[in-house]
Amino acid sequence: GVLSLLKKFTMILKHVHVN
């Protein structure tokens, strides 16, 4: 669903921000 996609996107964004 949309929530799952948003969650995934947030995780990726977080990962990029950390690196």
UniProtKB/Swiss-Prot annotation:
Disulfide bonds: none annotated. Antimicrobial and mast cell degranulating peptide which probably acts by forming pores in membranes. Active against both Gram-negative and Gram-positive bacterial strains as well as against yeasts. Has little hemolytic activity. In the context of inflammation and cancer tests, is weakly cytotoxic to normal cells, induces calcium signaling but does not impact cAMP production. In addition, prevents LPS-induced nitric oxid (NO) synthesis but does not affect the IP3 signaling and pro-inflammatory activation of endothelial cells. Keywords: Antibiotic, Antimicrobial, Fungicide, Immunity, Innate immunity, Membrane, Secreted, Target cell membrane, Target membrane. It is found in: Secreted; Target cell membrane. Belongs to the xylopin-like family. It comes from Xylocopa violacea (Violet carpenter bee). The keyword Secreted applies. GO terms for biological process: defense response to bacterium; defense response to fungus; innate immune response; killing of cells of another organism. The keyword Secreted applies. The lineage of its organism: Eukaryota, Metazoa, Ecdysozoa, Arthropoda, Hexapoda. This is Antimicrobial peptide Xac-4. It comes from the Eukaryota. Expressed by the venom gland. One of its GO terms (cellular component) is membrane.
